[in-house]
């Protein structure tokens, strides 16, 4: 059904390194979905290397999942800090979260799942 759950991606951090901050947050909720919130990692991820925190929240169906899907915080590790969180629910369910922060990440990973 249509849901109006909102959530904001909390946990930001600042890290003043240079590098390619590639936080992609492709929020592709298709169906009758009224979920708002910033899906993706927020915060300045300034690790030198490929910092690829991808939070592809692809809820298809009538789903109202929101929250911060992905990890954020001050990820100041050099190398590939790859916190990936693919939250994908098909059908009329709403699932989000499951933030798996791997690598040397010193921030807080917030898993907010509102059904």
Swiss-Prot record:
This is Sericin-1. It is found in: Secreted. Produced exclusively in the middle (MSG) section of silk glands. Provides the silk fibroin thread with a sticky coating. Acts as a cement by sticking silk threads together. It holds the Pfam family Collagen. Residues 1-115 are annotated as: Disordered. Keywords: Secreted, Silk protein. The keyword Secreted applies. The gene is SER1. The keyword Secreted applies. GO terms for cellular component: extracellular region.
């Amino acid at each position: 059904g249509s849901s109006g759950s909102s959530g904001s991606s909390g946990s930001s951090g600042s890290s003043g390194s240079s590098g390619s901050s590639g936080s992609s947050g492709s929020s592709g909720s298709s169906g009758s979905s009224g979920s708002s919130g910033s899906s993706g990692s927020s915060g300045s991820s300034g690790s030198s290397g490929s910092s690829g925190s991808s939070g592809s929240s692809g809820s298809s169906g009538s789903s109202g999942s929101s929250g911060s899907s992905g990890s954020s915080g001050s990820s100041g590790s050099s190398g590939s800090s790859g916190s990936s969180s693919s939250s994908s629910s098909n059908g009329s369910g709403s699932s989000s979260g499951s933030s798996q922060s791997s690598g040397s990440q010193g921030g807080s990973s917030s898993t907010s799942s509102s059904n």
